[in-house]
């Protein structure tokens, strides 16, 4: 038996796993303090993305649109960008960073966004807003290639390339978290804090889990500042935790400022978290404290309680963001589970060269399929027509109908998750994330078995 990597066998897409590149750029923009992105395209390119963000995080986020119409699609719509920047800066006096995010329509018609930004910098900003600090950043994210993952990767690079400067080198690291949840950022900051490591966190979205304060105010925007972004050029190392969600920025900093780039591994599970901490130790010289050794021991004890009795040999399908899917698969293997189908939902040609996928191909001793450019039909067809047997599905809420229709238990993980409450508060990374994931997988299986076995199933069946 082998691990086989293959592309989707169809040209068309049936029920996509991902949305498009501009969504990734918009997610970057809401992670920056005093930033509102302008999406140069139709209003739906913003409206539906904002809806998904709000469904997942249960917060409202500010994003703008150039409101492209039919005439702009025919004759060009650079004027819409100029008007959008003018209106945005007039209405929001605190905004300092304005990404201009392109879409499929504006890329196809060839609108010169870089030229418009140059014109605005030399004209409108000097004439109407002479005393304001305003940064206009072009982000080219056509929707007809890639996905929200590649759009995120491009946008992080563009932001870093715009701001990073070499001033006074320091002992900080750059932490490029990738597309994660507030709970993940909190867990990562906890690990760094225990090791006494300072970091420029891209992006600081812990505040998405925002309080409503006694005065009625609430904060629901990112807290990565312009100063943090500038300081990325002074760090001693850059950690891109996800290979496909931050590597472009890490490689830029390495090439421009000779800052070492450490790519991955995504710290999901005990093994990958251990590697992450060892990499931190090597890069900074800071020791791994006993407190983290204690947390590791607690996590190992929790996993030992579940692995052999409840999780071993369970057949799992996983879909979503590639780094998340691969990290979850590695974790499942450590728990003696069998991830039999991995669905990576975009057309990235680099998957075949991914060392983690190569390791799966070399080490897996049962039948595993990894499908690139996949959609949900790749999962449903295997269940419905090819007899794929599964004990568990891991993925975001968009795939819930397959779980419901075929009576297969499913743990919601990834983005977007909107049919279970509060999951964005919990980490999937670090030792805390390992405990949460393992216990949630077990509890999902327990709840399913209650409906399929007698009430004493846990004693008589497992």
Curated annotation (Swiss-Prot):
Top EC class, one word: oxidoreductase
Entries under InterPro entries matching the protein: ChlB/BchB/BchZ (IPR050152), Nase/OxRdtase_comp1 (IPR000510), Nase_comp1_CS (IPR000318), Nase_Fe-Fe_bsu (IPR014280)
Cofactor(s) required, per the database record: [8Fe-7S] cluster
Pfam families with a match to the protein in the record: Oxidored_nitro
Disulfide links within the chain: none
Annotated positions binding [8Fe-7S] cluster: 20, 45, 104, 143
Cofactor: how bound: Binds 1 [8Fe-7S] cluster per heterodimer.
Example GO molecular function: iron-sulfur cluster binding
Iron in keyword set: yes
Alphabetical list of SUPFAM superfamilies matching this protein: Helical backbone' metal receptor (SSF53807)
Single GO biological process annotation from the record: nitrogen fixation
EC number: 1.18.6.1
Catalysed reaction equations from the record: N2 + 8 reduced [2Fe-2S]-[ferredoxin] + 16 ATP + 16 H2O = H2 + 8 oxidized [2Fe-2S]-[ferredoxin] + 2 NH4(+) + 16 ADP + 16 phosphate + 6 H(+)
Keywords from the UniProt entry: ATP-binding, Iron, Iron-sulfur, Metal-binding, Nitrogen fixation, Nucleotide-binding, Oxidoreductase
Record PANTHER family: LIGHT-INDEPENDENT PROTOCHLOROPHYLLIDE REDUCTASE SUBUNIT B
Quaternary structure annotation from Swiss-Prot or TrEMBL: Hexamer of two alpha, two beta, and two delta chains.
Function: This iron-iron protein is part of the nitrogenase complex that catalyzes the key enzymatic reactions in nitrogen fixation. Other nitrogenase complexes utilize a molybdenum-iron protein or a vanadium-iron protein.
Protein family according to the UniProt entry: Belongs to the NifD/NifK/NifE/NifN family.
Protein name, UniProt field: Nitrogenase iron-iron protein beta chain
Organism: Azotobacter vinelandii
């Amino acid at each position: 038996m082998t691990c086989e990597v293959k592309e989707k066998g169809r040209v068309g897409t049936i029920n996509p796993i991902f949305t498009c590149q501009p969504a990734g750029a918009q997610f970057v923009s809401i992670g920056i303090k005093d930033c509102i992105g302008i999406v140069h395209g139709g209003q739906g390119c913003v409206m539906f993305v904002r809806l998904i963000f709000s469904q997942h995080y249960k917060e409202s986020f500010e994003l703008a649109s150039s409101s492209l119409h039919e005439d702009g699609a025919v004759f060009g719509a650079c004027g819409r960008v100029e008007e959008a920047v003018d209106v945005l800066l007039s209405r929001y006096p605190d905004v300092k960073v304005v990404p201009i995010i392109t879409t499929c329509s504006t890329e196809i018609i060839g609108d010169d966004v870089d030229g418009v930004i140059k014109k605005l910098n030399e004209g409108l900003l000097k004439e109407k807003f002479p005393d304001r600090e305003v940064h206009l950043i072009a982000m080219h994210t056509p929707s007809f290639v890639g996905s929200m993952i590649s759009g995120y990767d491009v946008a992080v690079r563009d932001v870093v390339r715009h701001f990073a400067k070499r001033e006074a080198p320091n002992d900080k690291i750059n932490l490029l978290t990738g597309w994660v949840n507030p709970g993940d950022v909190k867990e990562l900051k906890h690990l760094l804090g225990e090791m006494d490591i300072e970091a420029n966190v891209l992006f600081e979205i812990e505040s998405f889990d925002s309080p409503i304060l006694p005065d009625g105010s609430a904060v629901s925007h990112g807290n990565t500042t312009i100063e943090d972004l500038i300081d990325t050029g002074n760090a001693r190392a850059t950690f891109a935790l996800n290979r496909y969600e931050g590597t472009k920025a890490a490689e830029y900093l390495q090439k421009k400022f000779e800052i070492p780039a450490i790519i991955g591994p995504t710290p999901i599970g005990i093994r990958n978290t251990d590697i992450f901490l060892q990499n931190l130790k090597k890069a900074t010289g800071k020791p791994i404290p006993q407190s983290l050794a204690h947390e590791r021991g607690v996590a190992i004890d929790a996993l030992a309680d579940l692995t052999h009795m409840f999780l071993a040999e369970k057949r799992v399908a996983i879909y979503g963001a590639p780094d998340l899917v691969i990290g979850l698969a590695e974790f499942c293997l450590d728990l003696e589970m069998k991830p039999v189908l991995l669905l990576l939902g975009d057309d990235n040609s680099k998957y075949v060269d991914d060392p983690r996928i190569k390791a799966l191909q070399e080490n897996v001793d049962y039948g595993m399929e990894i499908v690139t450019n996949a959609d949900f039909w790749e999962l449903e067809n295997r269940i419905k027509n090819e007899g794929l047997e599964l004990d568990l599905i891991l993925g975001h809420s968009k795939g819930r109908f397959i779980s419901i229709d075929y009576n297969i238990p499913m743990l919601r993980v990834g983005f977007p998750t909107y049919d279970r409450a509060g999951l964005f508060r919990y980490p999937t990374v670090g030792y805390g994330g390992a405990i949460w994931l393992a216990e949630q997988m077990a509890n999902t299986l327990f709840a399913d078995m209650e409906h399929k076995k007698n009430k004493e199933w846990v004693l008589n069946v497992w």
